[in-house]
Amino acid sequence: VALVWLRQQGEDRYEVRRAGNSLRLYTNGVFHSQYNSAEPVTGSVWDLLLLPAFALRSGRPSRVLVLGVGGGAVVCQLNRFLSPDLIVGVELNSVHLQVAREVFGALASNVCLLEADAREWLAHYRGPGFDLVIDDLFGHVGGETERAIAADASWCSALWSVVAPGGALVMNFESEAQLRASALCRDRVIRRHWAEAQRFSTPHYANAIGAFFRQAPEWERFETRLQVHPELDQRRAQCRLRYSRGLCVSHQGLCDPTVKGGLGRRLPQVPSRALHHTRNALLET
C-alpha cells in the first residue's frame, strides 16, 4: 500500500494511500474513505448510501445533501451514476475537504462543498428541500469509528425538515440494532413523516443503512434502473455490488428484513466546532 499524500496538522495525521487502483483516506490510522474511478462500486458502504436514490419515484434526485463528506467517495458516486443538478456536501474537517477536492476529484461544477458543523448548518439553513439527504456523520474514538451525532428525536427532526416532498433520508448506522433504536424507528411522531423505511446491508460490514421515504418507493423499477449501469448490473459476472434489503420498521411495528441483492459501510468525522457558511445563490437554484 503506497503513501501518495500526507498531512500532519497538530496531533492529527492524514494519509492517502493507494491500494491497487483505489485511493484510501486515513485519519490517525482510521479508514475514512475509498474511491476508485475505474471501479466505483466495491461492495462497500458507499454503494449502500447511493442505492436508495434509484427507488425514488422521480427516478433521479435533483438536489442532494451529503452530511459527512469524508474523502468525497459518495459525492463521486452520485455524479457517476445519477448526475444530480446540485450536490451540497457539509464537512467539518477542512483537511478531508482538501482531500475530496484535490485527491478524490470531487470538483464537478454541480458540487458545493462547505466547511461547517452539520448541526449548525442545518439550524441556519433556509433554502429549498433536498430530494436525497445522506447522513454519514462518523467520528473515531480510540481507533474505532462511531456515529458522531446520536439519531435522537431532535436530530432526526432536523434532518426531516430539509427532505423535499417525494424525497428520502438515508442514514449510516454502526449496526442494525442502532438503526432500530433510532428515533426514526421508535418515535411515533417522527414515523408519521415517512411512507416506507428500508434497511440495506452487506455481508462484508456490520453497518446498517436506513432509507426513509416520504413517498412509497418504486421497487418494481429499482433493478431496471440499476441495470442501466454495468457496474450496478448484478446479472454481469464482473459486478461487485452485494446487498440485502428489507423493511426495517412499519407503521405497525418492527419487521423482519427480506430481499437479497448486495451492500456495505463507511466513516466520517466528529462535528464539534461551528464553522458555518452558506452559498445562498447556489443553494437556492
Language model feature labels by segment:
Residues 2-18, 24, 32-37, 55, ...:
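SAM/dcSAM-binding transferase cores
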Residues 128, 169, 273-277:
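Intrinsic disorder/low-complexity signature
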Residues 24-32, 139, 168:
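Short, basic/glycine-rich phosphate-binding loops at helix/coil junctions
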Residues 6-7, 18-19, 38-162, 178-186, ...:
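The AdoMet/dcAdoMet-binding core of the Class I SAM-like
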Residues 163-169:
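Short glycine-dipeptide loop
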